[in-house]
Amino acid sequence: IQPNHPDSVKLRFNWNAALAQDPFSDCGLYFGTQFVHYTTDCGNNWKIISPDLTTNDSLKQKQGSSGGLTFDVTGAENYTTIICISPSPHDSKVLWVGTDDGNVQLTKDGGKTWNNVGQKIKGQPKNGWVPQIEVSPHNAGEAFVVMNNYRQNDWKPYVFHTTDFGAKW
């Protein structure tokens, strides 16, 4: 995958970095750092289509000493990164994003604006891990969000459901 990203923008990567195929383009790919990156030419050229979608909590980051990886027991990044990207199969402008610090972000205009719909989820664990968002193949505004909170020794599973693009859960 090329070209190299400009050094002026520091990126945060996760061992479980998000990668998703655009269902409307054979060569369209999404990739997650703290930003959503998008290519229309199978990875030859990339553009950033989002702001930082994480909490960007600097207390959880060790970029200066890790080269972009936040330390955990393994030395891998596990805070303030995107770990899930789920494009809608209904509309090419709709994209759901989950982060490793509890955000569930949604764009309905191809990345021009973003809404942290996760803030509306009652009962979610604070700073939970959002490894999966499953968009309904039948209903445009419907999605299931999976969260976990094992980093806080909370082993309960969390699954949330919306039918209206995250307005209610």
Per-segment meaning from a language model:
Residues 1-169:
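Beta-propeller blade termini and top-face loops
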